[in-house]
Amino acid sequence: MNAPALADADVRVQFPGIDDPNYISVVKQYAVEHHIHAIISLNDLELPILSSCKKEFEDIGITLIVSDKRVVDITFDKWKTKEFLKECGLNSPKTFLSLKEIEHAIDKNNISFTVVIKTRWGRSSIGIQFPESMLEMELASELIRLEISRTILSNAGGENEKNQILYQEKIEGNEYGMDVLNDLRGNYVGTFVRQKLSMRAGETDKAISVIDARFEKIGRIIGTRLRHVGNLDCDVLERDGLLYVLEMNARFGGGYPFSHESGINTVGAYIHWLEG
C-alpha cells in the first residue's frame, strides 16, 4: 500500500493477488458497491484474466477497457507478437525460441553478439540478459530459467512452459515509445510517439515527443490489423533509418504521462467514449 499513485487516489484498497481464486469476485463486488462503471488494467499478468471475464462485468453494467482474448494472447506472448508483426509486413528483431536455433544462426553469421535473452512472457525487463559469448549465453539461459521458476511467470505460458525464453538480436539505436490508440470498438484513432532519453527499472524516465509519418504508418497498420481496445503501448527501435517494433503491450505503458503532458489526453477520450 505504498505505491506513489496512492497519494493522488480517492480511496486506498488492497485486493487479493491476481492468482487468488476470489480475485474477480472481489473486484466485481467492490465495483458494484462503489458504483464504478469502467475498469482499466496496468498489469500484463492481469490482462488474460480480465479479458476472459468481460461478459461477466458487462452483465452488471461495468465496462472492462481490456482487449479480447485474441489480442491479449498476441501481445502477452512475445513470440506471437513477432509472428503478428511479420504478417503485417513490419520489421522486428530476429528472434529464436531455443538456444540451439540461435547458436546455429550465429554459426551461419545470420546474427552476432551481443544478443538479448529474455522471458517470453516477461514484463518490466524481468530476467533480461545481454550475453557476449556462447558460454555467457548458456549460463544466462539457466539463470533466467531459475529466475522464472521463482516468480508468477512460471505458470504464464501454460502448455508452452518449455519455451519460456526468447533469444533475440540486439538492435542498437534510438528507442521510442509508441502509443497506438483505438476506440472502445477497436477502430483506429491515432499514433503518438516519444523518443526515450533515459530508462529506469524498465520504465521511461525522460523522453521528448516526436512527430514522424513513419510511425503513423506503422501505428495505423497495427491498430487496424490488431483491433485492440484503447491504448496499445509499443517499443520501437531505429537502426540505419529503419524502424523495428520490439514489443506491444495492450495497456497504458510507463511512458504514457509524457504523451499526456504533451496534450494527448487518452483518459479523457475514454471518458468521452464511455459517455457515448
Residue spans for each PLM region:
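ATP-binding N-terminal substructure of ATP-dependent carboxylate-amine bond-forming enzymes
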Residues: 1-66
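Short, charged, surface-exposed secondary-structure boundary motifs
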Residues: 5-7, 22-25, 73-77, 125-128, ...
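ATP-dependent carboxylate activation and anion-phosphoryl transfer catalytic cores
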Residues: 13, 34, 200-201, 210-276
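Short hydrophobic patches on amphipathic alpha-helices
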Residues: 31, 106-108, 223
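Short catalytic-loop micro-motif centered on adjacent basic/acidic residues
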Residues: 38-41, 93-95, 166-168, 233
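Active-site nucleotide/adenylate-binding loops and adjacent lid/helix of ATP-dependent enzymes
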Residues: 72-165, 172, 184-185
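Phosphate-binding site of ATP-dependent enzymes
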Residues: 141-224, 237-238, 242-244
